[in-house]
Structure formats: C-alpha cells, structure tokens
Regions:
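Short, electropositive alpha-helical surface patch
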Residues: 58, 62-63, 116-125, 156-171
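N-terminal beta1-alpha1-beta2 submodule of the flavodoxin-like/Rossmannoid cofactor-binding fold
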Residues: 1-89, 178-232
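A conserved mid-domain beta-alpha-beta active-site/ligand-binding segment of alpha/beta enzyme cores
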Residues: 136-153, 163-197
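Charged helix-capping and loop-helix junction motifs
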Residues: 77-86, 125-128, 160-163
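Short loop/turn segments at strand-loop or loop-helix junctions that form parts
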Residues: 7-9, 105-108, 147
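Short, glycine-/small-residue-rich phosphate/pyrophosphate-handling segment
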Residues: 97-143
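Short catalytic/ligand-binding loop motif for oxyanion handling, primarily in non-cytosolic enzymes
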Residues: 13-14, 69-71, 111-113, 152-154
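Short secondary-structure boundary/capping segments
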Residues: 92-94
Length: 232
C-alpha cells in the first residue's frame, strides 16, 4: 500500500509537533510527504499536478493543526480546487474511488474537552463530519483520525509511543487492528530497528511489542473463558 501524507501548516519550522512528526517519518518507498505551503509559497496550486499525484497512492492522509475546527487556508483551497467535478466526482469523476482518506490532527486542547460537557462540547467525530462527507462524496474510504492532543505537554515516553503510532498509521494496512500493529512491531525489530533506530528506541519498541503481545494473549484467554462459560 502506497501512502501520501499531505501536510499543511503556515509555518512548519516553528511547530514542535510538526517537526517531531517530520523527523519520525518512516524511511520507506511506500510512504511520501507533500508539504503544501512549501510547494506553493505563492498560494497558486497546480491542480493537474496534484491530481496526478493522488492517482499514484492508495491512502491519502491530511496532516494539519486542527484550529477553529478546520484546516489551514491553503488546505481548504486545495480541497476546493483539486477535488473538482469530473475528477473526484460527477460524470467520470471516479479517479479516487476506493482509495483511503484519513486525518492526522494536531490539537492544542486536552482530549477530555472534546465531549459532551467538555470545554469544546463536541466530539472529534462530530467536528470532522465535513471531511467524512468529502470522503463519501468522492467515494474514498474514511479512516478513523489519528489525533495528537497537547503535544508540548507530552512526556518523552508518550512521544516515543506517538512515534510508533504515527509510523503504524502511515505503513499498516489496518492501523486499528491489534494483530496488524503487533506484526508491525515484530517486523520492525527483525528488519528496520537494527539498522535505523538507536538502542533506546529499539529497546522501547521491544518493550511495547512485548506488552502488546501479552495484552493480546490475556484478551484472547478471557474471550475463550467467556465462550466456554456460555457453552456450559
């Protein structure tokens, strides 16, 4: 599966969260990064070039700061201009049909505030309805967003977990699958980590993989016991 990450940020060099994600980007031919503001500093988007780029990938992820419940202006412009009729929808407009559509949201407010009774009052699922509608309109499969809350307050351990989650989101066919995440961790240990990760990162991935495998085994054992009890 080939993944394209479209990044939009008015000043990416001053964003600690975006810099962290850029540095965490996997070294893989199957994953590419496309920074809109860097590509189009004058704000004039090459629509045909963008459309041709989209055709090359199976999964398209949009990475941006989620302020005022929306995206930076250049990404909004991108949606308006690139996803035009006869390309993304309408007569013969099925060029993106069957591809995956996902969001990577950097959010400054705490996760607990995005619920009924919280400061924001609405869930992330509710606030991202316009993006879900876009995906439906152009016949792409909408993925559950990867949400990153209050990055500056994350501990080093939390950031290491985020690094793993981020790479999984970009590389795994079903990033929500426990089995797929477990297989990815084992594969990283077998192939990538020995070559590209330092000792601390490799040890952390090993620890996470071991914990996840044990958690999965416990869940499976509990499920078997539940089934056995119901059969008696």
């Amino acid at each position: 599966m080939k993944t394209l990450v479209i990044i939009s940020h008015p000043n990416i060099n001053e964003s600690s969260s975006q810099q962290f994600l850029v540095q965490s980007f996997p070294d893989s031919r199957e994953v590419s990064m496309h920074y809109l503001e860097g590509t189009y500093p004058n704000g004039k988007i090459d629509v045909k070039k963008e459309q041709a780029l989209l055709k090359e990938y199976d999964r398209v992820l949009f990475q941006f700061p989620f302020y005022w419940y929306s995206s930076p202006p250049l990404l909004k412009q991108w949606f308006d201009e690139v996803l035009e009729e006869h390309f993304a929808f309408g007569y013969r407009g099925n060029k993106l049909q069957g591809k995956e559509f996902g969001l990577i949201l950097i959010i400054g407010v705490g996760e607990k505030e995005y619920q009924t009774g919280g400061q924001e009052g609405f869930s992330i699922s509710e606030l991202t309805k316009p993006y879900q509608a876009i995906a439906k309109k152009i016949e792409m499969h909408y993925l559950k967003p990867l949400t990153i809350f209050q990055f500056p307050y994350m501990t080093e351990a939390d950031r290491m977990k985020l690094l793993i989650r981020y790479q999984q989101w970009l590389m795994i066919e079903k990033p929500d699958s426990l089995k797929a995440r477990e297989a990815w961790m084992v594969n990283q240990l077998d192939e990538t980590s020995r070559e590209t990760l330092d000792i601390a990162e490799s040890s952390f991935i090993l620890e996470q993989a071991t914990e996840k495998i044990e958690d999965n085994r416990i869940e499976l054992d509990e499920l078997r016991m539940h089934i056995d009890n119901n059969d008696q």
